[in-house]
């Protein structure tokens, strides 16, 4: 359990504030995360890392000279939003472009991918690299699906040293790709982690057993085996990792590697050293030369009892980068002169301009806000159940993420009503708030979907049924484009597609929007229930697909819940589109 916190909702923000207060000589806080507080080389590439909070020293503790220039920090176990990532990247940018690098998780891929597109559009050259070192999470022929765990550190260190050496963005990206291809990790867990305010851990391990292949967000392992001795565990980890040698290495003898034995938060350093004693012996017996190993907590999983072993297969350049000096709050190598402090900067929130809207669109905005309030109420009533469903094969955080997102969206909608926003603008700003506060995969998906719907609704008129159906179809297409999910993958898409089709078909026959929405929502509910018979093909549940059989997808279920709640709003709205197919010409031109 977590003993010390104020409010669970403020934990991530307050830990960042405390971290910056403790390390002001190395980092400063910016909206969305932290950046170096010391001067970096003008014209150099900026390395921006990031992910959810709860993994310290990753990610903020790895910001400093010789390491990252900035870290985007999401909520606990939730990826930072694209808005947060962009904010950190802009603050870290030195004129030579930005490399975004992070562990390979669906939410991070979505948010960092969107941030890359925004930054490039702004004129800041940007590339990204998702770390894929966890050998338990996918076979070698599907390495792109592997998770990023403690191997994050190896990649972050290599690319940061390359940037310090003056490499340009393309060359830094090449180093990132090579370092990633030469990094392998495997871990075990003895117990799950419990987040602040939670009564139960995200997952449990049967007494006397250990879960092999867990993820750093508490994802269950691929198999449970009896807890072994320290030497037996070392042998399991080393033998598993040596079965998968990077391409181009034909013999172990004479190879140079670096090693990280990483504690996940609940294993004592003394225990780690006992395990490393045997790890070192086994590697030397294979003729390997170990270069500057690290033993300790480097990429944790809050208070999970567990550890992981990472092998970093060096070439001449990667060894030079691994051994290069670094001075970050939680990671130091060699010696560096103190950095030149930067002048204090005050970040002023950007003024949010509200576009003009017609009276008809402003009236419709009240209905949109009511729909978001209804979504909030249904999610809050089902947070625990959504988390339970998600925990069957995932990390169990879906309910918490949806709660954060929908509350932020409903609050933003209220603010937009007070500022006389039209329906489209209100929904788009609510979408941004949802994505920013929820983080994670669900935050990215809902942000993309509601933004697309809001764009189609616009601020010029009261949307009729056809326009709403067009907006839902655009939302579906945007979600599939950014999330890469297809029908049958056991995701929200499996409920969204039938909803969109049913809504379009019914409004095209002349059915009123409230009635069409209600019937389409029923189709979505049935489709969501039917996902129980599917096996997940993407996301964190994929490695444990069989465990999810018989349980519906949490994202599809939450979507169906919200669609049903919105149906009640539409049917109770006396000024709904069913009695107002179009606004008056005077209103639409006002």
UniProtKB/Swiss-Prot annotation:
Its EC number is 2.7.1.209. Disulfide bonds: none annotated. The keyword Lyase does not apply. It comes from the Bacteria. Pathway: Carbohydrate metabolism. InterPro entries: DhaK_dom (IPR004006), DhaL_dom (IPR004007), DhaL_dom_sf (IPR036117), Dihydroxyacetone_Kinase (IPR050861). GO terms for molecular function: ATP binding; glycerone kinase activity. It is an enzyme of class 2 (transferase). PROSITE patterns: DHAK, DHAL. Residues 366-568 form the DhaL domain. Keywords: ATP-binding, Carbohydrate metabolism, Kinase, Nucleotide-binding, Transferase. Residues 7-331 form the DhaK domain. It catalyses: L-erythrulose + ATP = L-erythrulose 1-phosphate + ADP + H(+). GO terms for cellular component: cytosol. ADP binds at residues 398-401, 441-442, 483, 540, 553-555. The active site is at 217 (tele-hemiaminal-histidine intermediate). GO terms for biological process: glycerol catabolic process. It holds the Pfam family Dak1. Involved in catabolism of D-apiose. Catalyzes the phosphorylation of L-erythrulose to L-erythrulose 1-phosphate. Can also phosphorylate D-erythrulose and dihydroxyacetone in vitro. This is L-erythrulose kinase.
